[in-house]
A protein has these predicted regions:
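Peripheral docking tails and interdomain loops at the edges
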Residues: 22, 363-403
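Acidic/His-rich segments in extracytoplasmic proteins that coordinate ligands and/or metal ions
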Residues: 104-172
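An N-terminal, globular interaction/scaffold subdomain
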Residues: 54-111, 126, 133
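Short, Lys/Arg-enriched N-terminal segments with co-localized hydrophobic residues
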Residues: 4-19
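Structural motif
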Residues: 54, 119-120, 346
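Redox- and metal-dependent alpha/beta enzyme cores, enriched for Fe-S-associated oxidoreductases
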Residues: 66-80, 87-88, 266-327, 331-334, ...
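A charged, amphipathic alpha-helical module
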Residues: 18-53, 165, 169-286, 290-298, ...
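A short, acidic, amphipathic alpha-helical segment used as a generic capping/interface helix at domain edges
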Residues: 107, 326-343, 361-364
């Protein structure tokens, strides 16, 4: 209930909770976020009618604040369906990562509305497959590729800082706009607030027993990226957090105690969600996602007080612990911290077929998890098809029974 003693912020959050309670129950909210990628097609169309620029992206390394500062809408184009892979394989090798083939296939066949709406596609020199795929994408749309260093040294940071400035200048010339430092700093504050809100949300799974399924948590984390109004997003997330807490207080044993699983590895979504479902259908709870859709994209913030805003943005994004980095200590640091904070019983690493950097790095992750953290580890290599669902269930059941 609202109280006269409430601060304006408390009143705002409570009103959002009340509105949410009137309109929707938690399962409906989870499903709504899960369908956000599809539901936002219409919103994207309406924004295009207002001549709002669209920037299509493929990676967590993309410095969103720069594009948002010019008033653009930023949308992820990574596809997670095998629908267009046969079309992609007419141009690309079959033994290529399904994420790359799917993304290219949707662009080539014009089946992705977000690609259709995008005025400019921005990629980064992450993995070799993506770098070459961007060259072919340039046949369909204007593509700008940022030169991402593959290390996190001081020299690499300086290069990445320069690349971010070059990207700003590209946007200014391409769209005939001026991007001010004040606009960039405003978006830094907004995106930091989004990261804090998402972190508050997924941190709920530190509770034992868990207040939600990993499948539902992933729907929010994945769907939030397709909420175009970043200023209102933190309020929506925090209203959901409050609602989950309220329901948990009434019924903390909704989900019985079970082995607590952390999922790491490649970006997952769409077809790759089958791994999460297999874990939870066979007696485990996914309580944490370390990968691109989870903690990896929210854990670090941009330093708001650094006098050099480009250096601050460069530091934040370059510190992301992706397997394209050599060496990659930040992934181990984050992984170790999450294992401790979430009281993880086992780690499941999900890698996509032909994703060489993540597949090669599984040995180092296995050693870290089993030897340094002393908990079980399992690696799963998959793609976007449904052909291995039976095998996945069998493997997960045996692994979780062992726990």
């Amino acid at each position: 209930a609202l109280s006269r003693q409430d601060s304006p912020n408390q009143i705002k959050v409570k009103r959002e909770i009340i509105t949410m309670e009137i309109k929707k129950e938690l399962p409906e909210i989870f499903n709504e976020f899960g369908e956000m990628r599809k539901k936002s097609f219409l919103a994207a169309y309406e924004m295009k009618q207002k001549n709002i620029p669209f920037i299509g992206t493929f990676c967590t390394y993309f410095p969103q604040e720069i594009a948002l500062a010019m008033g653009a809408c930023v949308v992820g184009l990574c596809s997670t369906s095998d629908e267009t892979i046969p079309d992609a394989e007419k141009d690309l090798p079959r033994n290529l990562c399904p994420l790359i083939k799917s993304s290219y296939g949707f662009a080539k066949t014009d089946k992705c509305p977000y690609f259709y709406f995008s005025d400019l596609i921005v990629g980064e020199t992450t993995c070799d497959g993506k770098k070459k795929m961007y060259e072919y994408l340039g046949e369909f749309k204007p593509v700008y590729t940022m030169e991402l260093p593959n290390s996190q040294s001081p020299a690499a940071l300086e290069l990445w800082r320069k690349e971010i400035i070059k990207f700003k200048e590209k946007l200014e010339s391409f769209f005939d706009v001026t991007i001010t430092e004040e606009d960039i700093r405003k978006q830094v504050r907004i995106m930091n607030e989004v990261r804090r809100a998402l972190k508050e949300f997924y941190s709920l799974c530190k509770l034992e027993p868990v207040p939600m399924l990993g499948q539902d948590m992933f729907k929010i984390l994945y769907g939030a990226a397709y909420k175009f109004n970043k200023e209102t997003l933190p309020g929506e997330i925090r209203a959901l957090v409050a609602k989950i807490k309220a329901e948990y207080e009434e019924n903390p044993n909704k989900y019985p105690k079970a082995p607590r699983i952390l999922v790491t590895g490649c970006p997952i979504g769409g077809g790759a969600e089958k791994c999460v479902k297999a874990i939870e259908a066979n007696g485990g709870h996914v309580v944490c996602f370390e990968n691109c859709s989870g903690a990896k994209s929210c854990d670090r913030e941009v330093d708001e007080i650094n006098p050099d805003v480009y250096e601050a943005i460069a530091e934040r994004y370059l510190s992301i612990g992706c397997s394209v980095m050599t060496p990659n200590p930040n992934r181990l640091e984050l992984l170790g911290r999450l294992i401790d904070e979430y009281h993880i019983d086992a780690v499941v690493e999900v890698t996509l077929q032909a994703c060489h950097t993540y597949n090669v790095e599984t040995l180092g992750i296995k050693r870290f998890v089993t030897e340094k953290k002393g908990i079980p580890y399992m690696a799963v290599e998959t793609d976007y098809s449904t052909a291995d669902i039976g095998q996945l269930n069998t493997r997960m059941a045996a692994f979780i029974e062992m726990l």
